[in-house]
Amino acid sequence: MRRLLVTLLLFTTLAATACRSKTATLNLLVWEGYADPAFVRAFEESHHCKVSASYMGSSDELVAKLRGGSAANYDVISPSSDVATMIATTGLAAPLDLAKIPSYSQLAPQLTSLPLVKSGGKVYGVPFTWGPNPLLYDTTVFQQPPTTWAVLWDPKYRGKISVWDDLSTVYMAAQLLGYDKPDPGHLYSLSDDELEKVKAKLLELKPNVRKIWSTGGELTNLFENHEIVAAMGWPLMTNQLRQAHFPIGETIPQENTTGWIDHMMITAASDHKELATEFLEYLVEARTQKQVADVTGYIPANPGAAQFMSAEEQKNLHLDDVQNYQKRIYFWQNVPRRDKYNEIWNEVKAAQ
């Protein structure tokens, strides 16, 4: 009997090992920079799996794919704070077992305390990174950082400006019109009349727009080819352009800017939830968070990443003055009338 039990135990162990040794593939739908080999390769090697990423250009693209029947194609997604709640509360994401994500307790309390990815007493996502949508500019054209988003409307830069194909461009125009005063949250609940005025403001910008970019690669190419001199962008592009030795500057203008808190979530349709959970734990570990910051230039959700950074690196990421830096960023919120915002933005894009 004992021999039979030993044989069964050995068979079970070998079978489990064989199943684990099969190369599983985690499919990601995430923002650019969130599956870089610089930090993903180590996970692939230690877990004998492959991480395959598709990149999204906007929150609306993510939502469209999840709602359009493509959810089963992805295991892990990285929704921002404007759509994370909708995804967490509509059955598109799987609840997390936080006991299997021990690094969750190390994440910044001001992020984990937010209700963005919580529903019915369950948590559906882990904060990953956060940051602004800054104004990027060619330092050979601007010897001093531009002080206002209004520079994008300056007639001298006709055909030399780029804006993002995202509602962030709508928010930016609304800021110039003062709709963020006194409550920045009002940017995400504009009235029809306010949206019409935003539309008119953006139509005034059209002659200056060389191209409306939708991927980071598009924007970096526009700068490198000297087709544009200024744009709304991401810190990721600043990092990439500096690595390419392009004279790029980054600033938050006097009106401040919008920004995001990105989460990592597991889709409800994933067939690899256990492996995906291990991946989320890996991504929010302090050492990995430092590597993510190196690639993206985004602020890590795990403050422990700072222990692996030099004083200069911490300063570049504003970790030496996080609270004041956060005050300059109006983090994206759920937009109840998102369809109306998109209608306005699409009309701007279609206008000649």
Which residue ranges define each predicted feature?
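Paired acidic/hydrophobic, glycine-rich loop segments that form the ligand-binding mouth/hinge
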Residues: Y74-S78, I212, V229-W234, E250
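Extracytoplasmic ligand-binding site segments that recognize negatively charged/polar headgroups
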Residues: S78-A84, A88-E224
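Conserved C-terminal helix/tail region of periplasmic/extracytoplasmic solute-binding proteins
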Residues: Q323-Q352
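A ligand-binding cleft/hinge motif common to bilobed small-molecule-binding domains
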Residues: A84-M86, M232-P247
